[in-house]
Amino acid sequence: MANIVVVGTQWGDEGKGKIVDLLAAFADLVVRFQGGNNAGHTLVVNGESFISHLVPSGILQGKMCLIGNGVVVDPAVLTEEMAALRSRGVAVIPEKFKVSASAHIIMPYHKTIDLVREEAKGHEKIGTTGRGIGPCYEDKVGRNGLRFVDMLDLPAFREKMARQVKEKNLYLERMFGAAPLDVDGAVAEYVGYAETLAPYIADVSRILADASDEGRQVLFEGAQGTYLDIDHGTYPYVTSSNTVAGNACCGSGIGPRDLSGVLGIVKAYTTRVGEGPFPTELFDDVGDFMQRTGSEFGATTGRKRRCGWLDAVMLKSAARLNGLTGLAITKLDVLTGLDTLEICTAYRYQGKTLSDFPADVKTLSQCEPVYEAVQGWQEDISGVRSAADLPDAARRYLDRITELVGVRVDIVSVGAGRDQTVVINNPFA
């Protein structure tokens, strides 16, 4: 039996959805343990694209999929996503999909607060997706949140929600001069969601405990990336949850002894959406090439991603923060055609060489990358299915990543399709 955590090692958008979809074939259950619909997975199965924001990617494999207590859930987005999947023949039914009773609910006022706050920051915006994730986590920590278990008692839910909407209306009007929300309309809308989702609400921790007792395999699906972690990321240009592997336990209701390994997803180059320092960012034709060839637009926001060379400094730190046991390198095919590749092996800061990722964004923003040149390749690798069939230069690139990060490469993605993958070591084997 193996229980594997999949996490992003950069700033998100590493291709976790494809890898989770691939590994779901070997798992019995797939669990989301943090974040919300501010993250999106794009999957290509049999030439058909699926974009998922909340429902775990394993749903396409017919697996039991769970949303853990660490996720904040917008019921409007969730019900819409469930309906969209069903319309395409995917079985999203209570027997195959559950939401933790302890998961917090994103309310309409969370989204409004998110947007008006960001607008008020002017040039100091942090690049929020405006989906209410941060304000929902604030209410969770402030003990003012509503959870899915509250939806199971509709009279009490109506009362709690009405009280919260009125309180948040005062905040919106007095702090930002924003228009108040319609209390009755908002409550009626969410009561509708409660009635729809009631059959899907469950004790996810109990389900996972039973699965463990039965020797079933579990795949834990992280969202965003290591450097968007609220504690370990490039604060304040981060998300509102812990994205590192340790949160798989807290966010799903299991103990650390239940985990077998952690697979870190690494894009073969580096990308970032929104604001924040990015030492290896490219502003030349190579950066444009990566953006264009890699179709680097956010699945959730549609925003153009910033592109740059692979940063081994941040990857080595990510390996430590997550306890990585393996790497999955994605979008290796995008680098085809470049004569020379660069890997950042250290930073230069005020005349000193830094080998560790700094916690201070001001320091990071002033860091200059120290590059090591690696030979590129010209061969089309999109049809490669064995590591031995990769060009010598591509294999050397992967080997160098392993040497710099100290973690072996288990999987290599050479295209968007599920079958466009080289599996060197299966984490579930």
Swiss-Prot record:
CC cofactor note: Binds 1 Mg(2+) ion per subunit.
One GO MF term: magnesium ion binding
Binding site residues for Mg(2+): 13, 40
Protein family per UniProt: Belongs to the adenylosuccinate synthetase family.
Subunit and interaction comment: Homodimer.
Function: Plays an important role in the de novo pathway of purine nucleotide biosynthesis. Catalyzes the first committed step in the biosynthesis of AMP from IMP.
Name recorded for this polypeptide: Adenylosuccinate synthetase
Species this protein is from: Desulfosudis oleivorans (strain DSM 6200 / JCM 39069 / Hxd3) (Desulfococcus oleovorans)
